[in-house]
Amino acid sequence: MARIAGVDIPTQKRVVISLQYIYGIGQTTAQEVLKNANVSEDIRVKDLNDDQLSAIRGEVAKIVTEGDLRRESTLNIKRLMEIGSYRGIRHRKGLPVNGQNTRNNARTRKGKPKAVTGKKQAGK
């Protein structure tokens, strides 16, 4: 397996698909990396020579990927929580951040439903 940016990418797949196994590289970025490295998108990873592999590694090194990108995202969320913005408060409470309704759904963010005891009816 070829190792790029600390990730073992699959050798049987095309290079443009294999690069997407790296966190922070999607389809468009993978295409740009290959274009800048002068490597065809259709070639398989196992067919790459050392020069092509090092060119791809050089291009990927210019992009924020993997641990650095995860750390940056986490720090951005922490900053929002520290300054007390609306988005930060929603993150802190574990509720949807982007304005979705929470009356009926939002189970992914809120977790399992909590049992709520009903109000007792007064006897007649």
Swiss-Prot record:
Keyword Ribonucleoprotein: yes
Region (Disordered): 91-124
Record GO biological process: translation
This protein's UniProt keywords: Ribonucleoprotein, Ribosomal protein, RNA-binding, rRNA-binding, tRNA-binding
InterPro entries recorded: Rbsml_uS13_C, Ribosomal_uS13, Ribosomal_uS13-like_H2TH, Ribosomal_uS13_bac-type, Ribosomal_uS13_CS
Gene Ontology cellular component list: cytosol; small ribosomal subunit
Gene3D superfamilies: 1.10.8.50, 30s ribosomal protein s13, domain 2
GO MF annotation list: rRNA binding; structural constituent of ribosome; tRNA binding
Subunit comment: Part of the 30S ribosomal subunit. Forms a loose heterodimer with protein S19. Forms two bridges to the 50S subunit in the 70S ribosome.
Matches recorded under HAMAP family: Ribosomal_uS13
PANTHER family for this protein: 30S RIBOSOMAL PROTEIN S13/40S RIBOSOMAL PROTEIN S18 (PTHR10871), SMALL RIBOSOMAL SUBUNIT PROTEIN US13M (PTHR10871:SF1)
Function per UniProt: Located at the top of the head of the 30S subunit, it contacts several helices of the 16S rRNA. In the 70S ribosome it contacts the 23S rRNA (bridge B1a) and protein L5 of the 50S subunit (bridge B1b), connecting the 2 subunits; these bridges are implicated in subunit movement. Contacts the tRNAs in the A and P-sites.
Family: Belongs to the universal ribosomal protein uS13 family.
Protein name: Small ribosomal subunit protein uS13
Organism in which the protein naturally occurs: Acholeplasma laidlawii (strain PG-8A)
Gene name of the encoded protein: rpsM
